[in-house]
Amino acid sequence: MDLSNLRPAIGSTKNRKRIGRGPGSGNGKTAGKGHKGQNARSGGGVKPGFEGGQMPLQRRLPKRGFKSLNKKVYALVNLRDLQDIFEAGSVVDIEALGQNGLVSRIYDGIKILGDGDLDKALTVKAHKFSQSAIAKIEAAGGKAEVI
């Protein structure tokens, strides 16, 4: 076997369906569309979600809730990530977090969450902190500074 005689595995490919090419093909005349009706016409068919005139599901169900236009979206970082990456005494700010791949896109700022343990004294600068994160940072001898 070489590159000049490679063939697809048996049964892995199908011949394409040539429609409207005479009665002997099995798909001549109406080309598999049947007789008349909306689906036989060019551009025929119903739009997605159309239920034949019955009130569609989307309109039968009640509206619920809303999306706040003023919602703040923070990039989240946990203390366990800071523990693994940063050395004791270092300053953790937006640039340091970005260089180490902990945040990629910042919309409304960075929030530090308290998941994991911290035993290094770090100076952490962020837009928001959870209460548990502040407690753990200060217990380890570090500082939590709000930007």
UniProtKB/Swiss-Prot annotation:
Biased composition (Gly residues): 21-31, 42-52
Family annotation (SUPFAM superfamilies): Ribosomal proteins L15p and L18e
Pfam families the UniProt entry points to: Ribosomal_L27A (PF00828)
Keywords, alphabetical: Ribonucleoprotein, Ribosomal protein, RNA-binding, rRNA-binding
GO cellular component, one term: cytosolic large ribosomal subunit
Biological-process GO terms, alphabetical: translation
Keyword Ribonucleoprotein: yes
GO molecular function, one term: rRNA binding
Domain of life: Bacteria
Location of region: Disordered: 1-62
Family: Belongs to the universal ribosomal protein uL15 family.
SUBUNIT field: Part of the 50S ribosomal subunit.
Function comment: Binds to the 23S rRNA.
Name by which UniProt lists this protein: Large ribosomal subunit protein uL15
Natural source organism: Syntrophotalea carbinolica (strain DSM 2380 / NBRC 103641 / GraBd1) (Pelobacter carbinolicus)
Lineage: Bacteria, Pseudomonadati, Thermodesulfobacteriota, Desulfuromonadia, Desulfuromonadales
Gene: rplO
